[in-house]
A protein has these predicted regions:
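ATP/nucleotide-binding catalytic cores
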Residues: 1-139
Length: 139
């Protein structure tokens, strides 16, 4: 990640533009989640987005609301469960502007079932003006 201020500014512009797929290359999951939470809070305060539209997934917490840290339902801890939750969330009542942060994603560098599922999720996010943010670390 570049310096935090530049990264936060770029992330804010991407979220305002509703870019459907954002990749953050980082090994610092906690710092990146804090930055996303800070940027998201700014966007909520400025009226761009709703605080009920930001979710994150970690292996230890499962899916949770990024602002309240409250677990969301019985989603399980796997990234595939988080992806299924996101699909349901985007389809539910045609909710727009939902954001899901996936901190652990399977290898999507090749053509396989996992990469196809992520592609389908991103396509749906694009249709519903949602955003999927994934953390990537190739080391």
């Amino acid at each position: 990640m570049s310096n935090k201020k530049d990264a936060a500014s770029l992330l804010k512009r991407y979220l305002i533009a509703r870019i459907p797929f954002i990749v953050l290359k980082t090994i610092e999951t906690a710092r990146a989640l804090d930055m996303i939470r800070d940027v998201s809070l700014e966007l909520v305060q400025e009226g761009w987005l709703d605080e009920k539209s930001f979710y994150a997934h970690t292996m230890s917490k499962g899916v949770y609301n990024l602002f309240t840290n409250q677990a969301v339902g019985n989603t399980g801890s796997s990234v595939l469960s988080a992806m299924d939750f996101t699909v349901k969330l985007l389809r539910q009542d045609q909710k727009l502007n939902q954001t899901m942060v996936l901190t652990e994603v399977p290898d999507i560098s090749g053509e396989n079932g996992d990469s196809q599922r992520i592609l389908d999720l991103i396509s749906l996010a694009s249709e519903m003006y949602g955003t999927v943010i994934v953390f990537y670390n190739n080391s």
